[in-house]
Amino acid sequence: MQERHTEQDYRALLIADTPIIDVRAPIEFEQGAMPAAINLPLMNNDERAAVGICYKQQGSDAALALGHKLVAGEIRQQRMDAWRAACLQNPHGILCCARGGQRSHIVQRWLHDAGIDYPLVEGGYKALRQTAIQATIELAQKPIVLIGGCTGSGKTLLVQQQPNGVDLEGLARHRGSAFGRTLQPQLSQASFENMLAAEMLKTDAHQDLRLWVLEDESRMIGSNHLPECLRERMTQATIAVVEDPFEIRLERLNEEYFLRMHHDFTHAYGDEQGWQEYCEYLHHGLSAIKRRLGLQRYNELAARLDAALTTQLTTGSTDGHLAWLVPLLEEYYDPMYRYQLEKKAEKVVFRGEWAGSGGMG
């Protein structure tokens, strides 16, 4: 049965988006997983914990015996059915456990006995993780051009349109501001870094890449932070600043934060609950910057937000949101970004409008 041994093999797995049947326990998978992995555990969290305690107290033979006792009969059959279905659905996939140890070998042997030969990652998730970390360190050494600009400048869409662009916010599932959350929960830090490494590897492999195009991000994107090796290189990068007219920016923000988010919430939760989730999302974003706005200004803008939501609910129009969005941009977001940009003015190599429409920076 074929097994993968070298780092080049591991990189090839990530570049090809090879389906990975990850047989670790759910708690391990949630802490960090590869982008194309599905979690079909040999043992659930409780079973894994019990086997771990047994191993410490009685040794490996007793732990192995307990594992076979816990995963037997109907439980084993149910898991075999799931693995078999996954193998048939992903004939070019691969098995993976923590370190390429007993769990993936046991599942591989059981599948072999059932007539399915399926390869495994010899070094397990740990080897793939180390490959991802090393790849990011190496690829981050290439020159970087950052796309900067005030909120609503279309930076993210501009990055997405570049063949050498990597959408950091898309990978983080967060748009990087107080209002940046999406309906997708953010991944663990390790999973985010693995996603980033895989995306950089794929982008680099599919073209003669000489430099990266990234959005000018802070260290944190929601709850995820950029790998230090990449963040350090970004501090040295040149910057192209998009300076679109204020009205164009407002159109983008209206589309992204009001029209699209309202649509996404109602699509996910239904009209009534979706509306409540949408209202809470906007209020939570404004509340997150209450201290910086000051209590009096926050209360004024929150009242305008409530009025805008009432208008939107009764008429469908989002125009009322301009009453709080415009001062929020003019008094908070724009001055903050311009202050940050002034500190790295010597790195700016371009300023000007971008003709793109839609999207959100």
From Swiss-Prot:
It catalyses: 5-methylaminomethyl-2-thiouridine(34) in tRNA + selenophosphate + (2E)-geranyl diphosphate + H2O + H(+) = 5-methylaminomethyl-2-selenouridine(34) in tRNA + (2E)-thiogeraniol + phosphate + diphosphate; 5-methylaminomethyl-2-thiouridine(34) in tRNA + (2E)-geranyl diphosphate = 5-methylaminomethyl-S-(2E)-geranyl-thiouridine(34) in tRNA + diphosphate; 5-methylaminomethyl-S-(2E)-geranyl-thiouridine(34) in tRNA + selenophosphate + H(+) = 5-methylaminomethyl-2-(Se-phospho)selenouridine(34) in tRNA + (2E)-thiogeraniol; 5-methylaminomethyl-2-(Se-phospho)selenouridine(34) in tRNA + H2O = 5-methylaminomethyl-2-selenouridine(34) in tRNA + phosphate. It is an enzyme of class 2 (transferase). Residues 14-137 form the Rhodanese domain. The active site is at residue 97. Gene3D superfamilies: Rhodanese-like domain. The keyword Transferase applies. Transmembrane segments: none annotated. GO terms for biological process: tRNA wobble uridine modification. InterPro entries: Rhodanese-like_dom, Rhodanese-like_dom_sf, SelU. Its EC number is 2.9.1.3. Monomer. Involved in the post-transcriptional modification of the uridine at the wobble position (U34) of tRNA(Lys), tRNA(Glu) and tRNA(Gln). Catalyzes the conversion of 2-thiouridine (S2U-RNA) to 2-selenouridine (Se2U-RNA). Acts in a two-step process involving geranylation of 2-thiouridine (S2U) to S-geranyl-2-thiouridine (geS2U) and subsequent selenation of the latter derivative to 2-selenouridine (Se2U) in the tRNA chain. Belongs to the SelU family. This is tRNA 2-selenouridine synthase. It comes from Escherichia coli O6:H1 (strain CFT073 / ATCC 700928 / UPEC). The lineage of its organism: Bacteria, Pseudomonadati, Pseudomonadota, Gammaproteobacteria, Enterobacterales.
